[in-house]
Design a protein with these regions (language model features):
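Sec-exported extracytoplasmic/periplasmic mature domains
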Residues: 50-58, 75-86, 97, 101, ...
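N-terminal hydrophobic or amphipathic helices/low-complexity stretches enriched
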Residues: 23-86, 310
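Extracellular/luminal Protease-associated
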Residues: 120-241, 245-248, 310
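Acidic/His- and Gly-rich active-site-bordering loop/insert found
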Residues: 52, 78, 253, 301-313
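Gram-negative bacterial Sec-dependent N-terminal signal peptides
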Residues: 2-22
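Soluble non-cytosolic domains of exported or imported proteins
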Residues: 39-46, 61-72, 86-87, 139, ...
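Long, well-ordered, tryptophan-enriched scaffold segments
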Residues: 36, 205, 209-218, 222, ...
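Noncatalytic luminal/extracellular "stalk/propeptide" segments of secretory-pathway proteins
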Residues: 55-183, 283-286, 293-297, 301-304
Length: 313
């Protein structure tokens, strides 16, 4: 889980901030800065990264041997830095229950339309994960709608949905967020609006059945191979509560998206250009799709590692 990595970074972050702070009410004495700087070396930063990324930890999947070893390592490191246990019952750990879902995706995902049919091949053209923590994710005869970036951001006067009813639809979305203006979505800085997690959540709030995010290396910051590897196995998340959920969380290559959009009677380049405006409105695609994904669902327990550094005030 992400928190296991960020926890280890806390002491380093504190150390770095102590060195950088040289003004204001929290001045760091020169002798403390000297000691801190001496301890920040390439070796000190490299060692924990090498260990946590090593094959010995077997990927650190939740509730695995590697997960246990990683937690023990983090606790030992925090203790060596002077932290006190910040977990449950005086220990270092905070228990977290998680749900693992392994989706049995079809080798071909088919779409039918007036301008032709399109078959997307698993891994080559599309990859997906289940949006539900149940034995199957099902989409039946759903229409497709291009919704630009799939963003609702009142503070930027941006709404890609414009009140259009997309319930039960499969939404085709662009990755990232509008980034061509420094005053709009912080320019090139990727905000939460640009993350795939937000896009799936946004679609769920609209009542959509599923999402296909169009992958490009520039918009994602990584090549298609990263999507293939990171979405190709068991996916872990917190247990679902009452929040709305989509059935399927999918990605498609740019080439696959172009074929889909063309079969739906549209041109992807023109849709992308239209999506770069606040006046954009969702564009229905003349396509239908059905898909059933069998899921293997497991419930396991892991933990965060927490340390407390007592203050002097």
């Amino acid at each position: 889980m992400t928190t296991k990595f960020t926890t280890r970074a806390v002491p380093l972050a504190l150390l770095l901030s102590a060195v950088a702070a040289n003004a204001g009410p929290y001045d760091i004495p020169a002798n403390v800065q000297t000691v801190a700087k001496a301890q920040i070396t390439a070796g000190a930063l490299e060692a924990p990264i090498r260990f946590l990324a090593s094959d010995a930890l077997e990927g650190r999947g939740p509730a695995t041997r590697g997960d246990t070893l990683a937690r023990l390592y983090l606790a030992a490191e925090l203790q060596s830095l002077g932290y006190l246990p910040g977990g449950e019952k005086g220990g270092w750990e905070q228990t977290v229950d998680v749900v693992g879902t392994t989706a049995q995706l079809p080798a071909v995902w088919s779409f039918t339309g007036k301008s032709g049919n399109v078959d997307l091949k698993l891994s080559d053209d599309y990859i997906a994960g289940s949006g539900v923590q149940s034995p199957a994710a099902v989409i039946e005869n759903a229409g497709l709608v291009f919704v630009g970036y799939g963003i609702e951001a009142p503070e930027y006067q941006w709404n890609d949905f414009k009140g259009v009813d997309v319930k039960g639809k499969v939404l085709v979305m662009l990755n990232n967020d509008p980034d061509w203006d420094p005053k709009l979505f912080a320019g090139k800085t990727r905000l939460y609006y640009g993350r795939w997690v937000y896009k799936y959540e946004s679609a769920a709030r609209q009542g959509a059945a599923g999402v296909i995010i169009v992958h490009t290396t520039p918009s994602a910051g990584y090549p298609w191979q990263v999507v293939q590897s990171s979405w190709g196995g068991e996916q872990f998340e917190l247990p679902a509560e009452s929040e709305p959920r989509i059935q399927l969380k999918a990605w498609a290559t740019e080439d696959a998206a172009r074929r889909l959009v063309k079969a739906g009677g549209q041109d992807l380049d023109k849709l992308i250009a239209a999506a770069r405006s606040r006046s954009f409105k969702p564009v229905p695609l003349a396509l239908k799709t059905s898909i059933k994904v069998e899921n293997k669902v497991s419930r396991v327990r892991t933990a965060n590692v927490a340390g407390l550094l007592p203050g002097s005030d």
